[in-house]
Amino acid sequence: MSKLTTGSFSIEDLESVQITINNIVGAAKEAAEEKAKELGPMGPTAMAGLASYRSWNLLLLDRYEPVLTPMCDQCCYCTYGPCDLSGNKRGACGIDMAGQTGREFFLRVITGTACHAAHGRHLLDHVIEVFGEDLPLNLGESNVLTPNVTICTGLSPKTLGECRAPMEYVEEQLTQLLATIHAGQESAEIDYDSKALFSGSLDHVGMEVSDIAQVSAYDFPKADPEAPLIEIGMGSIDKSKPLIVAIGHNVAGVTYIMDYMEENNLTDKMEIAGLCCTAFDMTRYKEADRRAPYAKIVGSLAKELKVIRSGMPDVIVVDEQCVRGDVLSESQKLKIPVIASNEKIMMGLPDRTDADVDSIVEEIKSGAIPGCVMLDYDKLGELIPKIAEVMAPIRDAEGITAIPTDEEFKVYIDKCVKCGECMLACPEELDIPEALEYAAKGSYEYLEALHDVCIGCRRCEQVCKKEIPILNVLEKAAQKSISEEKGWVRSGRGQASDAEIRKEGLNLVMGTTPGIIAIIGCPNYPAGTKDVYLIAEEFLKRNYLLAVSGCSAMDIGMFKDEDGKTLYEKYPGTFAGGGLLNTGSCVSNAHISGAAEKVAGIFAQRTLAGNLAEIADYTLNRVGACGLAWGAYSQKAASIGTGCNIYGIPAVLGPHSSKYRRALIAKNYDESKWKVYDGRDGSEMTIPPAPEFLLTTAETWQEAIPMMAKACIRPSDNNMGRSIKLTHWMELSKKYLGVEPEDWWKFVRNEADLPLAKREELLKRLEAEHGWEIDWKRKKIISGPKIKFDVSAQPTNLKRLCKEA
């Protein structure tokens, strides 16, 4: 082979010559070096793969041991099965019950991750097509725009186009993760847990890309603590106007409907309202300048079937995620057209993407089709308002609704034979027979009370031998309260600004702000929507920082105090103690985890890029935070919570969530699990059992409250912070459980840690019950605590972070 030499030649006289330049020698290296200079310091795990976080994950899983709650004893994954795995038996492929249960949980986590990532991909591609890849990311007064992206990939995108790389990274890793579920792949439960944690971190990347893309492109509020207040509830809808109802999570198509309404002066002539997270994002559209909003929120996922049965919508447009599988069949009964606007949910409807808008309207008006698929958003924007205008008078004239008349109501009540099948089928175990029995005697308040607790699943109706439309009966009994159902919720503000993080970071790390309480997730509550309101109210009164999102954020806004004010009207939307900030829809959850990460990056000056273990170690030991997904039902909720767990942020779930099959709970009595390094010299130091779980469930909201307060205690709390946190935890335990916690003394390092109002009493108890030596003249603890307080200690789980390592 001849040796290549350098030189030059002229192409001026050459004809019919095609020159292809592949890589310019040295150019890629130079570009990479320039990019590295721009990004700054880089941690060890940029563009992490399946094994990159394994050592950190196993460290977490060693302390927070998986507690498995399998749903059944069988595995039905392949044609060898079904295999009985009970009694420590293994399946034909060799997998045991632990491995199979780990696989089941992991499958739910990657499903949730894929859902958010696919949402982000669709949204990102669409806004790039419309607004161009050079559109800057504008999230408000922030320089740290993408903490989750930066931690996992090492990248810090500044434009829409630069968001493609992290999106491609998530998609590639999801393919690798999905492959591990195949028969004959991973079988160790502990490694499925590790992979689940990795998938959770990817989920927060996908969510972050989704929300920063729409915040930037659609002019959503940008880190705005005074984002507009939005009307919520069925009572907020003007029933004299045609009603468009949007259901789902991807707002891209709905923005075209709103544009058409604005351009054609229809915003005061018809109502547009949403269910689930599309509802939040349509109320954020073009609200960066705080214009008067006109879009409304009907409610959460639990309201979907109730709204359809009411007959109020004149057209329903669905996009993706959290859309009931019976939306079309239920809507057809009431002549409500359904338009599918996203490839992920097409409902078997005819595709009319290439058809003329007016011809589609005519088909729907005549009843030739019950709805259609419409993937052309320009046409969608015109189609939906036109259908609403045409169908509203037709449906009004026929008085279409599933709500029974007074006569029908009486007949249905009298048909009940008290067999109890409905109660057995109900996920909430509602005593429907008893309520119907009282109703038969003329007392309807019991039926009315079930309206808020009912999650609208319709399982009761399907087992009723007398074919009573139970959901309709409940709605009939609650007509008055439904008509008055009106609250206020703050539109999603987006992320916490860098300035807010700098100001509040010290309070969070020292513990003087007791903690961040994040109330997120779905409406599968065990005892009605008011639970999340009561939890939020309690923590706000105690100056915790509350971050909320999704369906839970909606339900918090549905209740008012004795002065007629919602929590959103009473408390500021700032990232500070006593603040109630609604970040927005489900994908905005990335801003909640991102806030904890930004405390490490901005306040503590830790390197974010490619540095997950160090950031997670910081939040685990220093940032008091706890999540609550009280009504979690979906795979997305599992992936969101698991993504918090890898960062050392614990989460409490409602009682239904044991069906996810896995919890992460430490043994608070095993002292060997509560040893860390002191970053100053690498010596071993003992810490209190805090937090004592990463993922667990509670049976009641009264149990959850003190559990969450305790979960905000951190090893690095200073004396004032520990005293404040112990005060709240002990008071809340006494208030809601009737007893003080039995292990409060384990968190006392010296007398300054004790709650100020009860210091002398607690010193006496420490002396009498635990044998601690007290100097009563100075009221100081002489001996007793196993944990010594050292204000300069640097607790860390990572040996490499120690100065003498």
Swiss-Prot record:
InterPro entries referenced in this protein's UniProt entry, alphabetically: 4Fe4S_Fe-S-bd, 4Fe4S_Fe_S_CS, CdhA, HCP/CODH, Prismane-like_a/b-sand, Prismane-like_sf
Keyword terms, alphabetized: 4Fe-4S, Iron, Iron-sulfur, Metal-binding, Methanogenesis, Nickel, Oxidoreductase, Repeat
UniProt xrefs under Gene3D superfamilies: 3.30.70.20, 3.40.50.2030, Carbon monoxide dehydrogenase alpha subunit. Chain M, domain 1 (1.10.8.190)
Pathway assigned in UniProt: One-carbon metabolism; methanogenesis from acetate
A GO molecular function held by the record: anaerobic carbon-monoxide dehydrogenase activity
Catalytic activity: CO + 2 oxidized [2Fe-2S]-[ferredoxin] + H2O = 2 reduced [2Fe-2S]-[ferredoxin] + CO2 + 2 H(+)
The protein's Enzyme Commission number: 1.2.7.4
Binding-site positions, [Ni-4Fe-4S] cluster: H249, C277, C322, C522, C551, C586
Cofactor requirement: [4Fe-4S] cluster; [Ni-4Fe-4S] cluster
Family per similarity comment: Belongs to the Ni-containing carbon monoxide dehydrogenase family.
Domain remark from Swiss-Prot or TrEMBL: Cluster B is an all-cysteinyl-liganded 4Fe-4S cluster; cluster C is a mixed Ni-Fe-S cluster which is the active site of CO oxidation. Cluster D is also an all-cysteinyl-liganded 4Fe-4S cluster that bridges the two subunits of the CODH dimer. Contains two additional 4Fe-4S clusters, dubbed E and F, that probably transport electrons from ferredoxin to the B cluster.
Subunit structure comment from the entry: Heterotetramer of two alpha and two epsilon subunits. The ACDS complex is made up of alpha, epsilon, beta, gamma and delta subunits with a probable stoichiometry of (alpha(2)epsilon(2))(4)-beta(8)-(gamma(1)delta(1))(8).
Name of the featured protein: Acetyl-CoA decarbonylase/synthase complex subunit alpha 2
